[in-house]
Structure formats: C-alpha cells, structure tokens
Amino acid sequence: MCDDEEEEATPLVCDNGSGLVKAGFAGDDAPRAVFPSIVGRPRHQGVMVGMGQKDAYVGDEAQSKRGILTLKYPVEHGIVTNWDDMEKVWHHTFYNELRIAPEENPCLLTEAPLNPKANREKMTQIMFETFNSPAMYVCIQAVLCLYASGRTTGIVLDSGDGVSHTVPIYEGYAMPHAILRLDLAGRELTNYLMRVMCDRGYAFVTTAEREIVRDIKEKLGYVALDFEQEMLTAATSTSLEKSYELPDGQVITIGNERFRCAEALFQPSFLGMESAGVHETVYNSIMKCDIDVRKDLYANNVLSGGTTMFPGIGDRMQKEMVSLAPSTMKIKIIAPPERKYSCWIGGSILASLSTFAAMWIKKSEYDEAGPAIVHRKCF
C-alpha cells in the first residue's frame, strides 16, 4: 500500500465507553453512530422457523428486543472483560453502523487512564489481526475531552457509565502521578436507583429492567445543591415528585429518589463504598500536583462524560470546590453542553490534525514489534 492511498482514507474515531459506543469519522463535529455497548443473547428457545433469529444481538437491536434477551456489557469499569463480545461490538460498528471496511481506514480508539496494560495490547492485537487495520492509535479519554474544550491546561473530571477519573493536564502534559480513578459512575448510580426504587415497592430485577431504571435516571435525575434541605422539601411537599410511564403503560411516581441517586457521586457511602466523592477526588488530584500549577487547575475544572449530564451538577461542584479550596482561590467549573460526546469530539479533532499523521501505529510496525508497541507509541 503506497503512502498516497493511506492519506486518502478518513480515520475512524471509536470511543468505546462502558455504556455507549460513540463512533464516526475524524473531522466530523459529532459521532455518526451512538449505540449502547450491549450484547444480548436470547433467554428462550426459538420456535418459529425462518424468523432469522440470531444467536446474539448488538446495540440498539439488543435494546429493542431486550424483553427476551439477557443483556451483557462487554466493558466494565472501562476495562474490556469479554473480548469475544467486544469483537462483536466492533464488527457491528464497522460493518453495520459506519458501513466501512476497517482494513482501509486508520482507527483511533480511546481508553480510561490507569487501565491494565494487557487491555491496550489486546485492543491493538484485535485491530491489526482480526480487522486488519492499516494503522491505529489508543488515546486517554480525558485528554481528548480537554482537546474538545479547546484548552491545554485544566483538570478533567470524566465520568461515564463505568469509571470516573480526574486527570490534571498542564500545557498539554498530563501528570500521571496525580491521575485518580474512581470506580463509581453511571452504572453504580443505576444499580443504586434500582435498590432505592425497591424500597418504594417498585421491583426492577432483570437486565432488561435495569435499562428502564437507567432511562428514569437520565430523564428525571438531578443533583441537589443542598442535600439535607432538598430531603426536607421532598418530605414536606410534593413539588419534587414526577411521574414516569413504564413500557407497559403503568405510571409510577418518584420523589426524593430523583436526587438521592446522583447524590451518591458526592457521598459514595450511600453505595457502601469507602471512597472519596467526585469533588474530593478532584481536590485530591489537584493537591497531588505541583504547587505552582494548582491555581490554573482550580480555574479550569472541565466536566465530561454522560454522568456529568445531571442538571445542577455544575453548581454543586462549584459549591463543594469552594468549600475545599483556599478561600482566595478563583474556581471555575466548565460544563460544555456537548460534554456527553466531548471525548469523541476531541478524538475527531486529534485524528484530523496533519501533525498527528506521524503518530499512528502502522501495521508494519506492529508486525515487527508485536502488541507491546502500543506502550511505546501511545501516551
């Protein structure tokens, strides 16, 4: 393959989250395909011949047939736990969603920081050996979020479905010693909401019902500015109650569950976790940095990822950070409206830069050095 051809193909950007796969072409301003990273397998025996039943469904198709499927997420806490399913997800992304041949386009993948090294190597191996990519690259999610917000300095709180992490970046350099990771994100909040709803007498048990609860969380959840005060309001009036219609037409009412769910981000003890909340994690991350760069980090708190989409999270974060930081410190929380996809957008920006062309891991380099090349070439 001569170099001229290689320049032609538009790079693919694929952000494999624990909850959603965001995929598309570099240079676009939004991902073409966004679908749940779910693989569903039938729970029952097929009896009707000629229905074209499959042994596995991926993404939206699995979501729409969830009533008869067992749903599994191949990515947990940002780490791929089931590679066979992950291959199915990638296959679906390339051939059904984007409709391109992966052997013709370079592919930029994303990864959570502090992931096991084997995870990257296996990703690299599958891309080159199963999909025959001409070139690929693995990038840290939070760094891409910062690209998308147009900054070179800031601390990114990236909270998705499986993992939250804080990454301080100064003048384009990430500070690896100050990166903190918190295995508390959207999926834990969904599970917690399932438990809280059970206390109210609404039983949600199966993998399909969890998806309903996730929808309730996304549509009705919010972050209270003052949790105790909000609990009082909820107890004394019905102003906070909202109703939700289930797929079968039943209408349920939810009150204080709306903000109790998201409160677990700030008080992980609700989930029985002994870790610091997201605000303390950001603070601890800043305190691990050099004393000279802290001021700039406080003034550039960038939120990204789907779990930061709760209404009220910016104000609450501001309030919590102000109480933790020194009193004279200027604190700014940046919550861009497109933050649900900011990681993908950053990848799209990065992969379309002309200077990035030299960064790709080429197939020839992989053939020479094996999967370990990914640690040399990718930060």
Swiss-Prot record:
The modification N-acetylaspartate is found at D3. Its EC number is 3.6.4.-. Belongs to the actin family. It comes from the Eukaryota. Actins are highly conserved proteins that are involved in various types of cell motility and are ubiquitously expressed in all eukaryotic cells. Its main location: cytoplasm. One of its GO terms (cellular component) is cytoplasm. InterPro entries: Actin (IPR004000), Actin/actin-like_CS (IPR020902), Actin_CS (IPR004001), ATPase_NBD (IPR043129). The keyword Mitochondrion does not apply. Keywords: Acetylation, ATP-binding, Cytoplasm, Cytoskeleton, Hydrolase, Muscle protein, Nucleotide-binding. PROSITE patterns: ACTINS_1, ACTINS_2, ACTINS_ACT_LIKE. This is Actin, muscle. It is an enzyme of class 3 (hydrolase). It is found in: Cytoplasm, Cytoskeleton. One of its GO terms (molecular function) is hydrolase activity. It catalyses: ATP + H2O = ADP + phosphate + H(+). Residues 1-2 form a propeptide. CDD domains: ASKHA_NBD_actin. Gene3D superfamilies: 3.30.420.40, Actin, Chain A, domain 4.
